[in-house]
């Protein structure tokens, strides 16, 4: 019998070991090993046992056979990687800059096997007459617990063991005594854990609008004809994108296919899951970070076994091992949380398209405010674009009031609530309607502005706001430009130059001062630390247990509250002035989403946008819910500045404990890239936005080019340089088309 060999990636994340090592497959494991399997192998001079993953199997020996070590065995509890996921891991490694073991662990949704839940039941063996006779005997002997159990058995043939020991209060010894006399027997069975806590309701199939029907018909026509592509649905808030997703999923299930529904935040899971569960029942499940290891493992096993058709979750749900995936839906595709912030820094949108290729599936992106990347690609014909232009309720979009905070200050109002917002809140409270107050803190990085005229201190070289640092200096986190904090506004001469520091707690306190007795709920990082906190807050507000919901960006994403008729956006300028080229896009997206929360029921809605820059195109376009005008302005800025999507961008971040060593390596690497690729545009190096975390210093430089593959070559150049130099106690991270300033 010919000898078989396995190429193995070892479970050590180090650049020197980022390659395959060949091992001989012992006879006893020949029939148990396949690509993706987790194995134990002797490694290094000391032959210490470590884990590894098999990526290929063959009969060609790369070295002298006597030098090839043998696989030691299979570890307990470790899960393997699905065959298609190995190819995906290789793609992630190449395109995002990481080791193969990091990529393999990324595509493993459940890391360990876990025993199934054991269910024990007591099953009656005696007929009812015999049982009643035994019951009478126990009552005469005053065997109270035994009699209680026999009475229950006489009324039902099967009783769950948990109910016996819990509700009936009967001990295990008493149960065993009944089993011993032949009155009943204990039966054990195993089942998968199901993390879905919602109750199935009435199945509803809404009447489709002509726009919705067109999308469904054309997507399915393409699919049935064997055409595979990515679709972008640009639908205003309340236009019925979710119904389109559900109809498409239903059609995929009829065709024997499964679907993955990606959502941007854990906070969306409860409401989204409820809608899907009401439609598809227990064939729906969820995959997210709040699940226990047992729950994660069981959802993967249920998916592989064909027990579920739909999985819902954030970007990690993308790696669910369905056997015949047909559709990936990416709702709110513009959201930053679709980009991983840890290595590998993959984007779910690009990765979903690669997964779809492997399964011959399709991708449907949906948003009221598509990312510039998605809309840009649709414009170039890479995606097929559909529009949903009408609200399903038939209602109008909310009336929007833009309040100039400079004018409020001039007229003596120093409150965080403008007079218009106070007037409308008073009206809603008197009518028993609900209000959402949104603090736009996303991307806040210590920007400084003039409270009198609204002027923001900006970098003269990068057209992003400068960030305030200790020592009274302002710094640009792209090119490193720095200047002292001015004492007077350079535009109007005012001395009112400062940053915005209000948080949700202060807003809640001020609201209660203004309206004693008002019922409030807060949704922010502090109030959503526990596993079920999102669901509890959303459910309480939906049930009318509060008049006002106060929160950050998580409260404006996709939630439907029919009684909300007013949305107040307290500080639109916070995200607008983040030191980030995407600041305008993020502001427009958040404001549009926030405004869209009002008037989603039968009652009309209103929104108030408070800002120091009422004429900025991100503000005016959001107030008008005019995406096209915003896109035309913003894409012009990106093209002129050479930012994504008009070009691609790579951030190379250098870490280390000694700042001088980090700075020197950043400079040397920048020089190497410049000398090898002098056609590139390079920014930096400069200290990172947060220049030190846990005593680790961070520097960054950026490379820009029209072709993504050119930046992959930059990554390869940096990696090869590091292999030659072998710097000690320093590490590198790559971030392609970063969504946040590093």
Show which residues each predicted segment covers.
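Accessory, non-ATPase domains that flank or precede helicase/AAA+ motor cores in DNA-metabolism machines
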Residues: 1-367, 379-395, 676, 702, ...
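Extracytoplasmic/periplasmic
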Residues: 660-675
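Short conserved micro-motifs at the rims of enzyme active sites and ligand-binding pockets
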Residues: 664, 694, 713-714
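Short coil/turn motifs at beta-sheet boundaries
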Residues: 1, 16, 34, 82, ...
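Inter-lobe coupling/hinge segments of SF2-like helicase ATPases
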Residues: 203-209, 213, 217, 227-663, ...
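Hydrophobic, Leu/Ile/Phe/Ala-enriched alpha-helical segments that form helix-helix packing faces
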Residues: 511, 595-598, 673, 677, ...
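A carboxyl-terminal module marker
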Residues: 671-694, 719, 732, 736-739
């Amino acid at each position: 019998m010919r000898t078989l060999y396995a190429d193995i990636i070892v479970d050590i994340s180090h650049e020197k070991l980022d390659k395959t090592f060949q091992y001989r497959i012992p006879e006893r494991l020949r029939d148990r090993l396949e690509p993706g399997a987790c194995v134990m192998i002797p490694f290094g001079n000391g032959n210490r046992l470590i884990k590894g993953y098999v990526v290929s199997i063959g009969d060609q020996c790369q070295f002298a056979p006597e030098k090839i070590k043998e696989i030691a065995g299979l570890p307990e509890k470790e899960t393997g990687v699905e065959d298609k996921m190995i190819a995906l891991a290789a793609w992630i490694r190449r395109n995002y800059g990481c080791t193969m073991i990091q990529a393999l662990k990324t595509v493993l949704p459940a890391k360990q096997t876990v025993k199934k839940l054991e269910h024990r039941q007591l099953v009656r063996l005696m007929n009812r007459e015999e049982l009643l006779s035994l019951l009478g005997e126990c009552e005469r002997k005053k065997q109270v617990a035994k009699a209680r159990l026999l009475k229950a058995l006489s009324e039902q043939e099967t009783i769950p063991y948990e109910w016996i020991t819990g509700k009936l209060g009967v001990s295990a010894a008493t149960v065993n005594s009944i089993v011993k006399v032949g009155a009943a027997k204990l039966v054990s069975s195993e089942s998968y854990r199901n993390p879905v806590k919602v109750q199935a309701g009435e199945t509803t199939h809404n009447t489709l609008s002509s726009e919705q029907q067109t999308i469904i018909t054309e997507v399915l026509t393409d699919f049935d004809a064997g055409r595979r592509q990515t679709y972008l649905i640009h639908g205003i808030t309340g236009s019925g994108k979710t119904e389109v997703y559900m109809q498409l999923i239903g059609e995929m299930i009829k065709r024997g296919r499964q679907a993955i529904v990606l959502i941007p935040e854990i906070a969306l899971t409860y409401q989204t899951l409820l809608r899907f569960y009401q439609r598809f029942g227990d064939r729906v499940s969820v995959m997210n970070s709040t699940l226990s290891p047992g729950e994660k493992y069981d959802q993967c096993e249920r998916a592989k076994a064909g027990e579920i058709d739909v999985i819902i979750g954030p970007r990690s749900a993308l790696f669910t091992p369905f056997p015949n995936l047909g559709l990936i839906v990416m709702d709110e595709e513009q959201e930053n949380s679709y980009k991983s912030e840890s290595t590998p820094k993959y984007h779910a949108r690009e990765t979903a398209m690669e997964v779809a290729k492997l399964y011959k599936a399709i991708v449907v992106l949906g948003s009221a405010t598509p990312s510039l990347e998605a809309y840009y690609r649709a414009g170039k014909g890479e995606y097929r674009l559909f529009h949903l232009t009408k609200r399903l309720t038939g209602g109008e979009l909310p009336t929007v009031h833009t309040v100039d905070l400079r004018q409020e200050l001039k007229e003596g109002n120093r409150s965080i609530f403008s007079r218009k917002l106070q007037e409308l809140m008073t009206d809603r409270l008197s009518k028993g309607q609900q209000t959402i107050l949104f603090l736009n803190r996303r991307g806040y990085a210590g920007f400084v502005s003039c409270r009198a005229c609204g002027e923001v201190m900006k970098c003269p070289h990068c057209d992003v706001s400068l960030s305030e640092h200790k020592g009274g200096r302002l710094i640009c986190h792209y090119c490193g430009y720095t200047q002292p904090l001015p004492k007077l506004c350079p535009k109007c001469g005012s001395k009112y130059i400062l940053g915005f520091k209000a948080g949700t707690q202060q807003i809640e306190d001020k609201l209660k001062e203004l309206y004693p007795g008002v019922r409030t709920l807060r949704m922010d990082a502090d109030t959503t630390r526990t596993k079920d906190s999102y669901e509890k807050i959303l459910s309480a507000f939906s049930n009318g247990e509060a008049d006002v919901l106060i929160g950050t960006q998580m409260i404006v994403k996709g939630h439907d509250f029919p009684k909300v008729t007013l949305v107040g956006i307290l500080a639109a300028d916070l995200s607008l002035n983040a030191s980030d080229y995407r600041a305008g896009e993020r502001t427009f997206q958040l404001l549009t989403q926030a405004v869209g929360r009002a008037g989603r029921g039968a009652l009309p809605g209103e929104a108030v946008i408070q800002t120091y820059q009422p004429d900025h195109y991100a503000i005016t376009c959001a107030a008008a819910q005019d995406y096209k005008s915003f896109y035309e302005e913003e894409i012009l800025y990106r093209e002129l500045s050479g930012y994504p999507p008009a070009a691609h961008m790579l951030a190379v971040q250098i870490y280390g404990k000694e700042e001088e060593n980090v700075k020197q390596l950043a400079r040397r690497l920048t020089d190497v890239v410049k000398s090898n690729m002098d056609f590139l545009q390079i920014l930096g190096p400069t200290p990172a936005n947060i220049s030190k975390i846990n005593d680790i210093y961070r520097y960054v430089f950026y490379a820009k080019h029209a072709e993504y593959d050119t930046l992959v070559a930059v990554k390869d150049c940096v990696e090869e340089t590091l292999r030659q130099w072998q710097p000690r106690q320093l590490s590198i991270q790559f971030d392609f088309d970063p969504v946040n300033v590093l």
